[in-house]
Amino acid sequence: MDATVGQALPEWRLEAVSPEKMKLFAAIARDPNPIHWDRDAVAERGLGERLINQGPTNLGYVVNMLLAWTGPASLRELTVRFTSNVFDGDEVVAGGVVTAVREDADERLADCEVWLDRGDGTRAVAGTATVALG
């Protein structure tokens, strides 16, 4: 696989974040924070009326995008900031751009700026990643 500086990464898109999956993930992860499954709890905290997606799930969308592009076991480094919430029903789009291509040891690597945007354009996750180009 080849990559060039400035190349856009193939987008990964989810049409609507599922409140049922938020609740299921909260149960599996034993996440006690009710903002992921109780609309009243969200409203009581002044966070609106929609459930808030878990940060690790939002991060997972970015990882899905990277691995769909470069394949399994290609992720070498990932650093992100959570800059906004993702709510139930939101469309999300993970994307990125190649910022450098380099050789390191026996691997050809691509450094990338990565993000997750809500459908309204709000950036929810922003960061950098390094992937092996195979």
What are these regions (language model features)?
Residues 41-47, 82, 127-130:
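Short C-terminal domain-edge/linker segments immediately following a structured domain
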Residues 66-94:
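Mid-chain, well-packed structural core segment of small domains
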